[in-house]
Amino acid sequence: MYSKRKAFLLLTKHRLSLLVVFSAVVSYVTIAESPKLSIVLYLSIGGFLITAASNAFNQVIEKNLDALMTRTKDRPMPLGVLKKKEALFFAFTITLVGLYFLYLCSVLTALIGLISMTIYVLIYTPLKKKTPWAVFVGAFPGALPTLIGAVTGQSQQNTIEFFSALLFLIQFIWQFPHFWTLAWFNYDDYAKAGFYLLPNRKKDVFSANMIFLYTIFLVAAAILPYLFNFVGVISLIIILMASFTLIFYAYLFYKYQTEDMAKKLFKACILYLPVIQLTLMTRL
């Protein structure tokens, strides 16, 4: 058991929320001609709080399911450290504060933030027990933080520019090999709660094929900014080096289809995305 202060922190999944902030801020700096420190601050606070609120609502909704799984049974809600009313009040409060800070960036930024949270909490979360297609739905809020940062940096605030859309596309496709490998090596634990999130609902050849295929799609998407002249040859070389490494691990997983190989590909995916994002940010 732990304190309520720690419980509120765990409710936010603060480490994951900080990674989301990283994607948003890097995308903002990538797109903005003259990045402003004040906007970086607003985007960081707003992005963190909206993501934290989404995670908090998710844990309230999945309290009973989390209690069934080894990886989630020690969360604040299953342990009863926080009451439902406390968690909901906290989530609603940080939602309002988060939206305010995103509004300081732009109206479109706040709107996309609200849409992202709504999809995650009201559509993706209840859909997880019903169909593997939940992963497709969840990929949208998973990638929207990149779009939030990108549109904040645009010179035109009433539209979504092409490069912003490309950044979103990369992170959108990244969600699939990332989450499916997680679902592969946590298959038995997810099954306890009735979550069957692999493409074919089970660890089989079809699911392994889809993981490998979407890794190829991800690499193809990562090259698009070069093909459309947003970055130069140096960036392309770095992207190709990172991509060949990712494909190598994807091939090993495809060949052996073990939990160990799934974990290695999962870790490779985690490293791949920030490498690509930071490379695109340099515009070299």
Residue ranges and their predicted role:
Residues 1-2, 61-82, 180-207:
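Cytosolic, membrane-interface loops and tails of multi-pass inner-membrane proteins
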Residues 19-25, 75-78, 136-153, 205, ...:
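Small-residue-rich segments of transmembrane alpha-helices in multi-pass membrane proteins
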Residues 35, 139-183, 187-188, 204-205:
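Functional transmembrane core segments of multi-pass inner-membrane proteins
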Residues 84-155:
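Intramembrane alpha-helical segments
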Residues 22-63, 71, 95, 110-122, ...:
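Membrane-embedded alpha-helical segments that form the functional core of polytopic membrane enzymes
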Residues 71-109, 203-227:
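Multi-pass membrane catalytic core of lipid/isoprenoid biosynthesis enzymes
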Residues 49-57, 118-126, 168-187, 219, ...:
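Transmembrane alpha-helical segments that form the membrane-embedded catalytic/substrate-channel core
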Residues 83, 247-275:
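Interfacial loop-to-transmembrane junctions
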